[in-house]
């Protein structure tokens, strides 16, 4: 069972790392009220906070 948890953790980690590298903007913090605006500006007007990440390919 620990092996399965390890595989799931690695898959999740790699997914987050890949998404962060391909989209280039910083994380979205829920404590910052202007985070959605900062994410949009970082992505040239098309960015959107998706969970803790700012993704530039989300509309």
Swiss-Prot record:
GO molecular function annotations of the record: chloride channel regulator activity; peptidase inhibitor activity; toxin activity
Alphabetical list of InterPro entries matching this protein: Scorpion_toxin-like_sf, Scorpion_toxinS_Cl_inh
Principal location class: secreted
Keyword vocabulary terms for this entry: Chloride channel impairing toxin, Disulfide bond, Ion channel impairing toxin, Knottin, Metalloenzyme inhibitor, Metalloprotease inhibitor, Pharmaceutical, Protease inhibitor, Secreted, Signal, Toxin, Voltage-gated chloride channel impairing toxin
Site (Important for the binding to the catalytic site of MMP2): 37-38, 40
Outcome recorded upon mutating residue 40 to A: Important increase in inhibition rates of glioma cell migration. Important decrease of inhibition of the catalytic activity of MMP2
Disulfide pattern: 25-42, 28-49, 39-54, 43-56
Domain of life of the organism encoding this protein: Eukaryota
GO cellular component: extracellular region
Subcellular location, record wording: Secreted
Result of altering residue 48 to A: No change in inhibition rates of glioma cell migration. Weak decrease of inhibition of the catalytic activity of MMP2
Signal peptide limits: 1-24
Tissue specificity: Expressed by the venom gland.
Note: Negative results: does not inhibit potassium and sodium currents.
Function: Toxin with unknown function in healthy organisms. On glioma cells, inhibits chloride currents in a voltage-dependent manner (when tested on gliomas cells). Also interacts with MMP2 and significantly inhibits its catalytic activity. May be internalized with chloride channels (probably ClC-3/CLCN3) and MMP2, thus inhibiting the chloride channels necessary for cell shrinkage and tumor propagation.
Record family assignment: Belongs to the short scorpion toxin superfamily. Chloride channel inhibitor family.
Domain notes: The presence of a 'disulfide through disulfide knot' structurally defines this protein as a knottin.
Protein name, UniProt field: Chlorotoxin-like BmK CT
